[in-house]
Amino acid sequence: MAGNNSNGGTRKASKSKGKIVIFAIEILLILIMLAILFLVMTKSGEGPKVVDLNTEDLGINEISKTDSTGANAGGQNGADGTQVIDTGYLNVALFGVDATTPNGLFKGSRSDCIMVASVNKNTGDIKLVSVYRDTYLNLGTDTYNKCNHAYAGGGAEQAIKMLNMNLDLDITNFIAVNYQSLIDLVDGLGGIYVDVNKNELKHINNYQITINKDLNLGGYTAVKETGYQKLNGLQATAYCRVRYDLPGGDFDRASNQREVIKAIEEQAKKTDPATLTKVFNKVVDEIYTSISSKDLLDLVTNINGYSIVDEGGFPEESMRTTGNIGAKGSCVIPVDLESNVVWLHKFLFDDADYAVSNTVKECGAKIKSDTSSYINKR
């Protein structure tokens, strides 16, 4: 599984910010499913906070290169030789933002969890990729910094543009949540099952104390042993926060977050429709998205028709390093952006012959120029 481990030094790539980090990806898949159930069963037009995005402002790169056969490399070939979007996949950006109020979902909050969920609409297979929050990338404004700054500067639109420009993706939809969503979702499902190891155990309860205080939840239940066990919403959120004493630090934390998604999917498939509807009613006000009810209805008709089949992290483990980039602090650095993007398209779309856009080449050259003198200097 790509991107799950790293050497011990990589844990320095992420600093403690003394705040609760939110994990949108843990709830993306199930929120879509719950939205369908809610809209169908109650026939209500109410739902998440929805925004319309202009696709022309989302930084979708033009691909004009062709391979030796004349077919477009990395996508379907249009009449003019440029890439056209492969409608067999739906790519959705997922943001967890450090917002403590509903308005913080719109702009001004950093996205401390960034993921891409790619859904194969023909098979129902879903692949998940974490984009590590401290990755040094073009923010969509020709400014380079940690990629989680994009959401703070221009909200979801700029964050999507950042992903599309740097990764040659065609994302036009997103879901963003605040931190209360994960707690409410897991509790509504009756808890989820994960395997807690000894390094994680000693930090879960400390994070529970902090989260309980910040959210004024009125108490917490300590996790007392290691092993495969049921966690409630607060415990699961604390589990997603743990990175200290993990061999890969923040990289292993991102892997744990993806494990939580799979646990939520598994639990949701065992839950009756009436309970799922109640859960959606609970979390609906904590969601900000571009996905309309019609698109949701077109996408999802049967919860059992979708399966998470693979997951990984970007930059890929063998093609990343870390470095303190001056005033920008400790960053995750794609050693070669072009190679990482080729890997990403092979991983998500089984495209073995992908050729990156000129935009990715330009971004990669700038990243190398900015970071070469800082790499591995702690």
Show which residues each predicted segment covers.
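Non-catalytic, solvent-exposed segments at the cell envelope interface
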Residues: 2-13, 17-378
